[in-house]
Structure formats: C-alpha cells, structure tokens
C-alpha cells in the first residue's frame, strides 16, 4: 500500500486538510468536527487558560478578543512578537501547532470512523513570500503538532496543482493568489 500524504493549507484566516481520493485521484477536503471544510485559524484561551481552537475559538473571540490569537501567520518570523494570555506565553510556532493539531485531530476522527489510518505525513502550504526562517518555523509547528512534514509548498503552486493541470494540456492558464487575509 502506498504511503498516504495529506495536504494542509495553514491559512492566515482559515485552514484545511485534504487527502487524495482513491477513486479519481483528486484532492478532497476532509471536513472538521463541525462538518465544515475550513477551520478558522484562531486560538482562544478560556477562563482556565485552556486553549480552544477553530470555530468555537472564533465565536469566543467576539466576546473577549483580548484572550484570542488570530492572524498568527503574519507574525511567523517576527522576533519581537511577545504575547501572554493569562499565564500562557504565546509564540507563532505554538499557535500554529495548535491549529495544525486541531485539523489533524478532526481529520483522524473522520478517518477512524471510516477505518482509515491516522494522518502523519503532510505537505504544508506557505505563502510564496515566506523566506527560509518562516518556512523553518512552519515546519517546526508541524513537528510540534506531531506531524512528519515532508515538504512546504508555495500556495500558488498548491493552487495550480489542486486545480489540476492535466485537462489543460497545451493551454495556458494563470493562477492568481488573492489570499484570505481580509476575509475574517
């Protein structure tokens, strides 16, 4: 049996995880625990200092934004980024790892129900403008989340691959990465 590799879009506003369909070899997004294809890239710390990740975190953020972390990808290589919520020291790697873990935990629940193996090997997308430092920190976040990060892929390249170039042989096409940073 071939090794299963999963694709993760660790987005600024929303994130998702996908697998390749065994039927038609096309990517399929694995729904999260709320049966949605994307998970908000938000972490909220409750009254006890415990992190909540995803949709619930985004809803809680509306009530108390001071205990929430969003848009963390923008801070990935900012050495002066310092944030403490309660007694918890926040770092971009730590928050990104929590988001990745939420995606994988939800995917594993869905896969376990279907008798499939757990998510372990992944490729994570990163903005094309990310330098070596941001890429290394993103890889570290994946490792902190317990993943084997096989590669980091530029987001526009991932979009082109996801769109599927096989049916466009001999034709020109363009991928424009508008991003989602303003869609929160």
Residue ranges and their predicted role:
Residues 1-40, 45-176, 180:
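N-terminal phosphate-binding loop and flanking beta/alpha elements of the actin-like ATPase fold
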